[in-house]
Amino acid sequence: MIRPLHLSMAVALLCALAYLLGGRPASAQHQHTVLTGQAAFTDAAHESPGIRRHLTVADLPAPAPQESVDNGPKIVPRPAGMLPIAPKGFKVELYATGLDNPRLIRTAPNGDLFLAESETGKIKVFRGVSPDGKAAQVFVFADGLHQPFGIAFYPAGPNPAWVYIGNTDGIVRFPYKNGDLVATGPAEHLADLPGGGRLRGGGHWTRDLVFSKDGTKLLASVGSHSNVDDSDSHPEEFHRADVLEFTPEGKFIKVYASGLRNCVGEAINPITGELWCSTNERDGLGNNYPPDYITHVQEDGFYGWPWFLYGGPSGGIQDPRHPGKHPELQSKVITPDILVNPHFASLEMLFYEGRQFPAKFKGDGFAAEHGSWNRAQRGGYEVIRLPMKNGRATGEYEDFLTGFTLPDDTVWGRPVGVAEARDGSLFVSDDGSRSIWHVSYVGSR
């Protein structure tokens, strides 16, 4: 007997069909081309797995402050049966749901998945996979933390002794050995960081942590206190919009790199050993200006904030809100490696080292795009792939995991974190649907 579809399932199927056939181009149309120039600018309705884009500074419009809008997403429940959309050959499963503000995720050497539930001040641990695809076990590793975000295991290798946590106001660590599901000792405070706060267009509170490849440097990213306040006259911007270098014991060494407005996600390129940042650029200059970016970070490098934007013939372009400021720095502004569409809010990133995905993915990057609010046409809300050649960016990026928005311009999912599972599959945290997704390759090779 054929049973009638449940109404919610029918609505979900119709919604998904409309989404696929309505506002979204077929990815096959662009799988073998790279969109450049004005064609590379996009919105969520035209994001689809397999589409590649290559934005350059020559493609960028002039600043247009009059275009700026406050267009935050309307978050709605995930329609029943709806999943993120991955490239052909990939399978997406729901790994965990009902979470409270799931943010950054990192995989421990033994394969356990650590999650920062920033709003509740908790670090959770997920272990294994049940027959239904969900996590087999979930534990609270630690709580009572201050908006935790960054997670790093030290030393590198199969037997770490510590797990470091980036609170919004400092760095702490817990004793840790492989397999620990609950902290076996209290948090040890190592260093203070400038305190955070949640403000639209500023007050960036996330603090990511990574160790250099040789293990001698602890690098902490600290976003700006404001959208674009002049740090000369705003002391609250001290040691913000920077990557700060510490020893593993928490001794401050120096500002490792500056002018990075909000480096939310850090990663070490395993081939080159270089630090990379996934960075949110400033707001208020127009729908398509300036692009967010993902880049390798030069030690002692300057990336422009707040006085300059990247991409000028002499280095930087003066931010129109800071005319004439610091001309001596203009030539020092570094142009990033990968320009992502403007206001996409690029968050956690990683470099893929596994073998579960096809070989062409080895060494490429992935980054979570949380989605725009300062743009008339909503964009982002996806995970992107960052093609690499011998550890160097090609400048392109590719839509990888999409489908988090609906045809009526509402949003059901917002990717935040990406982590590689021990078997080489991918986890994606999503604070829109309060979930973690599991992406694996099941196609032919």
Task: List each language-model region with its residue ranges.
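Beta-propeller domains
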Residues: L83, N110-A135, G179
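Surface loop/turn motifs at the tips and blade-to-blade linkers of beta-strand repeat domains
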Residues: L94-L99, V140-H146, L190-G201, V255-G259, ...
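Blade-loop segments of beta-propeller domains
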Residues: P102-R103, K122-A156
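Beta-propeller domain segments
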Residues: T33-P87, P160, V172, T206, ...
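Hydrophobic beta-strand segments that make up the repeating blades of beta-propeller
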Residues: L113-L115, A161-I165, K217-A220, L275-C277, ...
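A detector of repeated loop/turn-to-beta-strand junctions in beta-rich toroidal repeat architectures
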Residues: T120, A135, T168, T184, ...
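Asp-box/WD-like beta-propeller blade repeats and closely related beta-sheet repeat scaffolds
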Residues: Q137-V138, G144-P148, A152-Y154, A161, ...
